């Protein structure tokens, strides 16, 4: 709703809407900036939330999210950046990819490895603070060198 208010008021408030709205936009709608498209997006997002679980919506999102360097979806991005199958991802590598989501151009691990590592470390600390990872996993992940293979060549 914040983005819709911004459009109506003429102020850009940023933000791409909820994850469900982004799934609708990525799979169903165009990226044109019109009130009609935004209203369709909101309506379809409500419908989608009735049909799918949060986990199913997240899976759709992660399979189509833009992760820089022409990579869409975590599996493709992991293959591109690390040269391995996503099933082999470490916590540190997954956090690095998750860090790209917010601003792919600014935290691109190939073009800006320092910003990418800072963002990765922030995500790891948030994961720890929310009890998703243990103290040991945090410390091991912070020292893990999750440098993309693209930089090693």
Please describe what each predicted stretch is.
Residues 1-3, 7:
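Conserved catalytic or metal-liganding residues and their short signature motifs at active sites
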Residues 145-153:
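A short, hydrophobic C-terminal helix/tail in secreted or cell-surface proteins
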Residues 10-142, 146:
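Non-catalytic, structured segments within soluble enzyme domains
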């Amino acid at each position: 709703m914040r983005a819709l208010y911004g459009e109506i008021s003429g102020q850009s408030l940023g933000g791409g809407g909820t994850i469900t709205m982004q799934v609708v936009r990525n799979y169903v709608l165009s990226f044109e900036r019109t009130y009609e498209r935004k209203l369709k997006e909101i309506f379809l997002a409500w419908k989608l939330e009735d049909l799918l679980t949060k986990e199913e919506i997240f899976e759709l999102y992660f399979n189509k999210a833009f992760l820089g360097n022409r990579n869409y979806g975590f599996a493709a991005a992991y293959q591109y950046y690390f040269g391995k199958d996503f099933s082999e991802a470490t916590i540190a590598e997954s956090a690095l990819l998750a860090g790209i989501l917010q601003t792919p151009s600014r935290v691109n691990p190939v073009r800006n490895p320092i910003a990418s590592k800072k963002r990765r470390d922030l995500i790891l600390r948030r994961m720890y603070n929310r009890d998703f990872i243990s103290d040991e996993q945090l410390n091991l992940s912070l020292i893990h060198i999750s440098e993309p293979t693209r930089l090693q060549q």
